[in-house]
Amino acid sequence: KFKKLSGGGYFKIINQSVPAALKNLGYSEKESEAIIKYATDSASFAGAPFINHQSLSEKGFIADEIKRLDAAALTAFEIGFVFNKYTLGEECLQRLGFTPEQYNDFEWSLLEALGYTDEQIEAANDYVCGTMMLEGAPLLKEEHLPVFDCANKCGAKGQRYIHAHGH
């Protein structure tokens, strides 16, 4: 879920009963960390599928720009929001071959312009920003999913929830 900060802004947290429940279900600390990371985020492009430090470097990004992307990923809810002139600077975008007309257009996607597919962007987004759900988490056994069901579907792709008659 998202926690609103008193000074403005939001950050992602997981219900504090989740780590305890995972422990009680017999998951190791390492397994629990992987499950929680799936839901919340890795907050870095390091190791992300498709859009990662190596692929970004191959596309022409320099180390400092990749560091800026990682720093912006710490608070991002979608990776598309960090790939812009404000994070990277116009010099970077021009060096990569893009024009002010392109990167000043709010409809324009740098990730798509770099050749990434919607599926690749979605996979990287899930890794970097988290899925906001436990469904599909690595190592989480299917039979344990009901333990984590709640009143609403979680995340953009969540399907499970407790029906109103179950409350």
Task: Please state what every model-predicted region is.
Residues 1-167:
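Long, C-terminal-biased catalytic regions of enzyme "large/alpha" subunits
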